[in-house]
C-alpha cells in the first residue's frame, strides 16, 4: 500500500471509532492519513443559511481532527471538508489522492442498521475502486466503546472468481504489516437438484 489512508467521518463519536484503525494502518504502512467529512446540502433556498453553516462546521471539524491526530500517523496528515453527496464525494476524494484504503465506521445488523450502512458504508463498498475497511464499534449503555486495533488473523472469502481473488494481494499486505495469520475460505454449496434426505449435508 503506497497511498494515504482515507478515513471518512461525520462528526459523531460513533464515526470517530474508525480513527484508531486508520491511524494504525497509516503507521503500519508508513503512509499518510487523509481526514474527510462531507456536508450534504439541502437543495432549497430556505436552507441556504443552514447549508453555509453546515459547511463551516465541517471545515472546522476536519481542521480540529487533523490537529488532534498530529504526530500520530505514519506520514503527512491532510484533510478535506467536502460538500455534496457523501458517497460520491468520498469516492472522488479517494481517487484524487490515490488512497490505498477507505476506513469508516458502521453499525451492525440491528433494526436501524440500514439507516447508516445503506446510505454511506454500503455505498462505499459498492462503488469504491479501493479496499474499504468498515469498523463496527461496540455500544454499551448508549456509549460508543472505542477499541484499539488488535489484528491477529485476516480472513479472505473466495468464491472461485477473479473478482473475489482481487482481495488477496491487499489481504496479504495487511497480514504482513500486522504480522497476522492469513486464512482463505471458500464455501461449496450443493445444487438443489442433488438434495436428498439421505445426504445430511443437503
What does each model-identified segment do?
Residues 35, 78-81, 134, 184:
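A structural preference for short, hydrophobic beta-strand core positions in alpha/beta folds
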Residues 19, 51-64:
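Short, surface-exposed alpha-helical segments at coil->helix boundaries
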Residues 145-147:
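Active-site-proximal loop->helix
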Residues 1-4, 19, 24-28, 91-143:
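Gly/Ser-rich helix-loop-strand patches that form or flank binding pockets
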Residues 1-52, 149-201:
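Small/aliphatic-rich secondary-structure junction motif
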Residues 81-89:
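Charged docking surfaces used in two-component/phosphorelay signaling
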Residues 72-78:
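A short helix-to-beta-strand connector/capping loop
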Residues 42-45, 89, 111, 142, ...:
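Generic structural signal for helix capping and beta-alpha/helix-loop junctions
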Amino acid at each position: 500500500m503506497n497511498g494515504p489512508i482515507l478515513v471518512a467521518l461525520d462528526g459523531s463519536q460513533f464515526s470517530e471509532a474508525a480513527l484508531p484503525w486508520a491511524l494504525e494502518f497509516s503507521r503500519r504502512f508508513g503512509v499518510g492519513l487523509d481526514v474527510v467529512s462531507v456536508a450534504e446540502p439541502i437543495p432549497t433556498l430556505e436552507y441556504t443559511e443552514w447549508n453555509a453553516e453546515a459547511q463551516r462546521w465541517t471545515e472546522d471539524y476536519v481542521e480540529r481532527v487533523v490537529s488532534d491526530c498530529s504526530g500520530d500517523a505514519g506520514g503527512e496528515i491532510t484533510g478535506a471538508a467536502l460538500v455534496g453527496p457523501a458517497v460520491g464525494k468520498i469516492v472522488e476524494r479517494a481517487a484524487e489522492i490515490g488512497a490505498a484504503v477507505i476506513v469508516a465506521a458502521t453499525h451492525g445488523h440491528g433494526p436501524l442498521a440500514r439507516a447508516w450502512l445503506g446510505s454511506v458504508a454500503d455505498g462505499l463498498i459498492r462503488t469504491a475502486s479501493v479496499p474499504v475497511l468498515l469498523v463496527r464499534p461496540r455500544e454499551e449503555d448508549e456509549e460508543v466503546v472505542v477499541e484499539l486495533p488488535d489484528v491477529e488473523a485476516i480472513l479472505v472469502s473466495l468464491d472461485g472468481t477473479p473478482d473475489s481473488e482481487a482481495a488477496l494481494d491487499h489481504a496479504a499486505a495487511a497480514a504482513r504489516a500486522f504480522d497476522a495469520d492469513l486464512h482463505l475460505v471458500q464455501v461449496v454449496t450443493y445444487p438443489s437438484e442433488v438434495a436428498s434426505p439421505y445426504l445430511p449435508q443437503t
